[in-house]
Amino acid sequence: MKYSRIVVMGPPGCGKGTQSSLISEKYEIPHVSSGDIIREEMKKSSKEATVIREMVNSGRLAPDEIVNELVLKKIRSMSKYILDGYPRRIEQAGMLGDDVDLVIFIDVDEDTCISRICGRNEGRDDDDEEVGRKRCMVYNKETAPVLEFYKRHGKLLTINGCASPGTVFEEIRRSIE
């Protein structure tokens, strides 16, 4: 495979984590999930954790300054990674700079995302329809400029994410090999 630093983007419930894990396993590239990093931070009893919990549980994005520090700390020492869920804002894309070879956008309509979110039974506080719809709204508002940014730089690969996970992964595999 010709890419070593890959970002996987898409709306909540599109399958970012699933596809990132499949890519990671197939190509032996570490998977870094910004969502996992944030959820781990939320378990702590710090002031930052309280702020993150309040924002995430109401469907909003965690503050950039906290997320940037957590994610960049994790990936800066890595020569290869699959990063999912980051960047979500154009400023975050700027923080990554040239540390991205390819951005895979998993394109899924909102109703499919909501259905997946409500049906995944992971026990997450943000896995209900109302919060899911708000998360999709925030995603569409905040992330569209990021996708355009990577498209302008010739780094965006759009994949239809409405099929089964195996079918979606095969389309990704064919596109990146």
Swiss-Prot record:
AMP binds at S34, R39, R60, L61, A62, G85, Y86, P87, R88, Q92, R124, R135. ATP binds at G13, C14, G15, K16, G17, T18, R120. One of its GO terms (cellular component) is cytoplasm. It is an enzyme of class 2 (transferase). Monomer. Catalyzes the reversible transfer of the terminal phosphate group between ATP and AMP. Plays an important role in cellular energy homeostasis and in adenine nucleotide metabolism. Residues 119-127 are annotated as: LID. InterPro entries: Adenylat/UMP-CMP_kin (IPR000850), Adenylat_kinase_CS (IPR033690), P-loop_NTPase (IPR027417). Keywords: ATP-binding, Cytoplasm, Kinase, Nucleotide-binding, Transferase. It comes from the Eukaryota. Residues 33-62 are annotated as: NMP. The lineage of its organism: Eukaryota, Fungi, Fungi incertae sedis, Microsporidia, Unikaryonidae. Pfam families: ADK (PF00406). Belongs to the adenylate kinase family. Its EC number is 2.7.4.3. The keyword Transferase applies. It catalyses: AMP + ATP = 2 ADP. This is Adenylate kinase. One of its GO terms (molecular function) is adenylate kinase activity.
